[in-house]
Structures are given as structure tokens and as C-alpha cells.
């Protein structure tokens, strides 16, 4: 069950502080409460309402067995992104977004296979037979691939949902998701465009306290949905075990095969 979201916690985390009034996007006007000392203040009542919708969406997607990709390359967000994604068995990009990460996924998969080959060669001691310069080159390439791709190393197909911590910094990821029709959940500060997000949350995307709180809620919603999915699968298996009937779509197939009557085959 999801932990109750409290408005007080949102205020204490500084979730309501936006950017300078000079940097705002007019499309965020409906989600801005006002301004203070030259800085926009986000309307946390709107944020609270939208947060509950986002959490319900994440839980339902997880219950349907969808996979999630967390994207956040800001320095203050990077460690939180990795921790949250790993906690809910999801994937992440917390360094630089490589162009074509999603739209050219086959090429990315080739890079991942190359990374695995480098690791196996190093473990076998193959590099001991090479010149020092060649070993240094391969190790640099391996380190580069690990830095940028380690969070998607086990992602065998495109994600079901992409969660973007910040929009302006992750605009290339946003464009790729829109091109492929992958639903997005995006944190939007006062300088962002809500028209580029499927599901969004108006919030301070620079505050570590706010990010930690939001990601904890996201994690909990996904884990709750994943638990529902596991429970449903367990119930299906139990039903098959008891009845011997497997339900597939609208058809019911029995796992019990009737013995053929030998007499029926006689002429």
C-alpha cells in the first residue's frame, strides 16, 4: 500500500520553488501560484493532485508488467536515479544521454555486446597478450561503455514507460520517446513545457530533498504494482494446479489429456 502523500512533506522539501521569473515557460502558468523575490512559486495543490494521478499510473503500468527507464543526468539527481531504479528492478541513464539510445536501440545493443566481450576477454586474460597501448585503449573504451550504458545493460527491449527527472536537460530523451510513442512521466520546473509530457509533475527539479521524496514515492508505486503482478501470476498458477485448466485469452484448454479408447480405432 502506498504511503500517504502529505502536503507538509512537499513544502518542507522545497518542492514548490521554481526558477527565476525571467526563465519561465508561459505554458507552466496554470501550475504557478505566484512569485517571491524574483522566483516563481509552484502551486503545490496542483502538484499534490497530479502526483496522485502519476502514482496511480505508475502502479497500474507496473501491475501490467511494464518496464521502466529512469532518466536524470543532473549531478544532484544521478545517484538517486541509480538507487531508485535498482530498488524497483528498473533501468536508468544517469550520465550523458547518448543520441539514439531508444530510436537506434539496435546499435546500442551492439555496444552492450561489445562491453560484454571486453569483460569476458579481460577475465580470460586475453588482454595479457596485447601491447600496453592496445590494452589501455580497450580499457578506456570499456570504462566509457560502462559509464554510459551500465544502467541499461540488462534491458532487452524498449521500456514501457520512461521517467524523466527534468525536461530541459533531457530534451533529447523526450524527443526520442515522442517519436517512438513511449509514454513519459516528467518532472516539470517552471521553465518547462507540459505539452511535451504525457504525465507530469510540477516540481522543483534541482532540490535534492524534493527529488529524494518524489523518487521514493515513484519507487513505492512501482513496487506496489509489481507485487500485484506477482500475486496475480501466483493466483493463476494455483488455479491451473487445482483445476488443470489453463486460461488463454477467451479459450480454455485442459492440461488433462483423455485416454483414447482403443475400441474406437477399430473398423
Swiss-Prot record:
Its main location: plastid. GO terms for biological process: translation. One of its GO terms (molecular function) is structural constituent of ribosome. It holds the Pfam family Ribosomal_S2. Keywords: Chloroplast, Plastid, Ribonucleoprotein, Ribosomal protein. It is found in: Plastid, Chloroplast. Gene3D superfamilies: Glucose-6-phosphate isomerase like protein, domain 1 (3.40.50.10490), Helix hairpin bin (1.10.287.610). Residues 237-267 are annotated as: Disordered. GO terms for cellular component: chloroplast; mitochondrial small ribosomal subunit. InterPro entries: Ribosomal_uS2, Ribosomal_uS2_bac/mit/plastid, Ribosomal_uS2_CS, Ribosomal_uS2_flav_dom_sf. Residues 250-267 have a biased composition (Polar residues). Belongs to the universal ribosomal protein uS2 family. This is Small ribosomal subunit protein uS2c. It comes from Chlorella vulgaris. The gene is rps2.
